[in-house]
Curated annotation (Swiss-Prot):
GO terms for cellular component: cytoplasm; cytosol; myofibril; nucleolus; nucleus; plasma membrane; protein-containing complex; T-tubule. Pfam families: Calpain_III, Calpain_u2, CAPN13-like_C_EFh, EF-hand_1, Peptidase_C2. Residues 639-809 are annotated as: Domain IV. The active site is at residues 123, 327, 351. Transmembrane segments: none annotated. This is Calpain-3. Ca(2+) 3 binds at residues 724, 726, 728, 730, 735. Its main location: cytoplasm. It comes from Gallus gallus. The gene is CAPN3. Residues 580-638 are annotated as: Linker. PANTHER family: CALPAIN, CALPAIN-3. It catalyses: Broad endopeptidase activity. Residues 9-31, 578-639 are annotated as: Disordered.
């Protein structure tokens, strides 16, 4: 059955962009960007991808076979723990039933006091969990509550996380790492409650290992729990209405966290990667010295059991006031009360350790509470307990804390949430080294090669108090998979973005803005800074118009994937800019060479002629006379005479040459161009040229075919010399984009990526041999496509035989 070769599918899958009707990308499903491009980058994957079984299917199978689930993708061994070095002690992986009697998934509802940090620097993750427990709808989405150690128990559990635009279901078994029968990592304040430990394991699986969770920003986990978008404030530079912002965030159900810089340059909860050995050493020491501590609560007749306490391994620094530097806290409430006749604004925070609290004004036992009546204490949920939660005045909060992170919920977080009015557009992209990883504006030669996204702001805000015609929107740029790739040496890139207004004459077009535009136009808005966080976001207010967003890493040549989200209060459109895929075609007065299928030559000599073959006899005669006149003029030239003599000497009487002979001819001619530094053409290059220029299937090319090839090479040679400004004999892969355009070809980013992968060396340079081979292939494949595309609609249909004939002999 013939398959349509059409560009529409791949580009819509990749970025929601409007595709070129002349693209030659085949239809495809899955695999990232789809189409031929995804077929190339995933060609080593199994031909048939078996659909993974769902939680329900696996759970049912375990019950039917009366077995406990064992996760093959996250096994109970060292590979799931640490990747940088081995742990000198042996952990035992145990199921909850082996750790304590009467284990429970959740006891009395999941709440923020259930979470106690273990021997891992993931306080950022636990602070986010504590925030999550404040929103029961979100909590039930992340932690499906229909799971139990009693009814239909099969040793299998699942949790759901937002992952770069999609919600994914992470399935795990319930084997947990222990030492001396104690959980090593996160645990509940109640010994027989395990939802927090299992949630941490699922999150570790999502990122490849427990070690991958060491160090991070709370908003990273908040986003993975909600699909929300972050706002980040340096408290010393916070707006005057910061209390109002925090109060409004709590009312909207947003998640919020805060932290204190340690003045050592560390992020909270994170040690330098080189210190993982020290982390493990301290962890071992703490585990070996850990003592069980028991509460005085009477547990008779309940499912609760005594909790143990292990002080977490820490790079954090405790202050005399009880707060901890380099540490993340959950913001669980923001309230206002009356104190001695005056309004007092308070902030409630929680330490993920489940202990170690603020001991200043408004702490659990402070004298300020003596002036608050009992009813107000109940409203504020004040209690005296070493549970890690405490109140602090807004003034002291602003004095001691340095960062505030807010994760705002988006319309797709909960379908029933009617308070949200944002419209959201999501675009996925990638920076490719040597092609579309151009770095920031400091690198003008490559900045313009970064992916570009058009933003159309169509409607102004509904704000009767604001007379300006303004559109409010938020841009969020997130880099993908960097935490999961830590074991391969990956770190977070320093990222940011800039926004430019598109000239009115270019509104509605799909053209990739070129280098000169950015040299002579200033940005209308940009991220305040480039920062090495997973996501950077910024609010903007601009007049209705058409803009282009340029996401980038700070330095060029840094390869990675990203997701760009645009949130607007009113209707807007956002899509990736993709050039229309096309090539300049020769004048219709020139008769094109027919394309002949190899298998048809011996039979019917079937031809697929170009549109130019249709013409009147008088027109043909005129063209022939013009060709003969032009040929005579060329033959008079010294180069032509020399050219024919060389060709005749090598080709012999049949005046046709094979790949070895073509190589000799080209190299003999190229040698005479002293200003072109090249070692000549490789045999494989001439083999490819023969295949692409051979129109009669003889495996050789005649003088006319060679003449056509040489004319092309001469024009391409001029382009090469123009961009080889330093006469090194190479051009860099970024310059190749302009060279391709100068040669009459217009391609999209996916095709530029492929050219870079196929023809550039490890230094992202393209030599003359590879340069010419690339252009010969582009020229031949465009001519072939146009020959098949008789109705000019940008779609051709080929059966398998035709497709293989066209692609294998090329």
């Amino acid at each position: 059955m013939p398959s349509a070769i059409n560009a529409a599918v791949a580009q819509q899958t990749a970025a929601g962009s409007v595709p070129s009707t002349t693209s030659t990308t085949t239809e495809g499903t899955g695999g990232g960007t789809g189409g031929i491009y995804s077929a190339i980058i995933s060609r080593n994957q199994p031909i048939i991808k078996v659909k993974e079984k769902t939680y329900e299917e696996l759970h049912k199978k375990c019950l039917e076979e009366n077995i406990l689930y064992e996760d093959p993708d996250f096994p109970p061994n060292e590979t799931s723990l640490f990747y940088s070095q081995k742990v000198p002690i042996k952990f035992e992986w145990k199921r909850p039933r082996e750790i304590c009697e009467n284990p429970r998934f959740i006891i009395g509802g999941a709440n923020r006091t259930d979470i106690c940090q273990g021997e891992l620097g993931d306080c950022w993750f636990l602070a986010a969990i504590a925030c999550l427990t404040l929103n029961k709808k979100l909590l039930c989405r992340v932690i499906p509550h229909d799971q139990s150690f009693i009814q239909n128990y099969a040793g299998i559990f699942h949790f759901q996380f937002w992952r770069y635009g999609d919600w994914v279901d992470v399935i795990i078994d319930d084997c947990l790492p222990t030492y001396n029968n104690q959980l090593v990592f996160t645990k509940s304040s109640q010994r027989n409650e395990f939802w927090s430990a299992l949630l941490e394991k699922a999150y570790a699986k999502l990122h490849g290992s427990y070690e991958a969770l060491k160090g991070g920003n709370t908003t990273e986990a908040m986003e993975d729990f909600t699909g929300g978008v972050i706002e980040f404030y340096e408290i010393k530079d916070a707006p005057k209405d910061i209390y109002k912002i925090m109060k409004h965030a709590i009312a909207r159900g947003s998640l919020m966290a805060s932290s204190i810089d340690d003045n050592l340059g560390f992020h909270y909860g994170a040690a330098p990667r080189s210190d993982i050995g020290e982390l493990i050493a301290r962890m071992v020491k703490n585990l070996e010295n850990a003592q069980m501590t028991y509460s005085t609560v009477d547990y008779q007749g309940t499912d609760e059991r005594p909790a143990w306490t292990i002080m977490p391994m820490q790079y954090e620094t405790r202050m005399s006031c009880g707060l901890v530097k380099g540490h993340a806290y959950s913001v669980t409430a923001v309230e206002e009360t009356t104190y001695k006749g005056e309004k007092m604004r308070l902030v409630r925070l929680r330490n993920p350790w489940g202990q170690v609290e603020w001991n200043g004004p408004w702490s659990d036992k402070s004298e300020e509470w003596n002036f608050i009546d009992e009813e107000e204490k109940i409203r504020l949920q004040h209690k005296i307990a070493e549970d890690g939660e405490f109140w602090i005045s807004l003034e002291d909060f602003m004095r001691h804390f340095t960062k505030l992170e807010i994760c705002n919920l988006t319309p797709d977080t909960l379908e029933a949430d009617k308070l949200q009015t944002w419209t959201v557009s999501v675009n996925e992209g990638r920076w490719v080294r040597g092609c579309s990883a151009g770095g920031c504006r400091n690198y003008p030669d490559t900045f313009w090669t970064n992916p570009q996204y058009r933003l159309k702001l169509l409607e102004e805000d509904d704000d009767p108090e604001d007379e300006e015609v303004i559109c409010s929107f938020l841009v969020a740029l997130m880099q993908k998979n960097r935490r999961k790739e830590r074991k391969l040496g990956a770190n977070l890139y320093t990222i940011g973005f800039a926004i430019y207004e598109v000239p009115k004459e270019m509104h509605g077009t799909k053209h990739h803005l070129q280098k000169d535009f950015f040299l002579y136009n200033a940005s209308k808005a940009r991220s305040k800074t480039y920062i090495n966080m997973r996501e950077i976001s910024e609010r903007f207010r601009l007049p209705p118009s058409e803009y282009v967003i340029i996401p980038s890493t700070y330095e060029p040549h840094q390869e990675g994937e990203f997701i760009l989200r645009v949130f607007s209060e009113k209707r807007s459109l956002s899509e990736e800019v993709e050039n229309m895929i096309e090539a300049d075609r020769p004048s219709k007065k020139k008769k094109g060479k027919p394309i002949i299928f190899v298998s048809d030559r011996a039979n019917s000599n079937k031809e697929l002629t170009t549109d130019e073959d249709a013409g009147k006899d008088g027109e043909k005669t005129h063209v022939d006379e013009k060709k003969r006149s032009s040929a005579k003029a060329r033959e008079k030239s010294e180069e032509e005479t020399q050219f024919r003599n060389i060709f005749r000497q090598i080709a012999g009487d049949d005046m046709e040459i094979c790949r070895e002979e073509l190589r000799n001819v080209l190299n003999n001619v190229v040698k005479k161009h002293k200003d072109l530094k090249t070692e000549g053409f490789e045999l494989e290059s001439s083999r490819s040229m023969i295949a692409l220029m051979d129109t009669d299937g003889s495996g050789k090319i005649n003088f006319d075919e060679f003449r056509h090839l040489w004319d092309k090479i001469k024009s391409w040679q001029k382009i090469f010399k123009h961009y080889d400004a330093d006469h090194s004999g190479t051009i860099n892969s970024y310059e190749m984009r302009n060279a391709v355009k100068d040669a009459g070809f217009r391609l999209n980013n996916q095709l530029y990526d492929i050219i870079t992968m196929r023809y550039a060396d490890k230094n992202m340079n393209i030599d003359f041999d590879s340069f010419i081979c690339c252009f010969v292939r582009l020229d031949a494949m465009f001519r072939a496509f146009h020959a098949f595309d008789k109705d000019g609609d940008g779609i051709i249909k080929l059966n398998v035989l035709e497709w293989l004939q066209l692609t294998m002999y090329a």
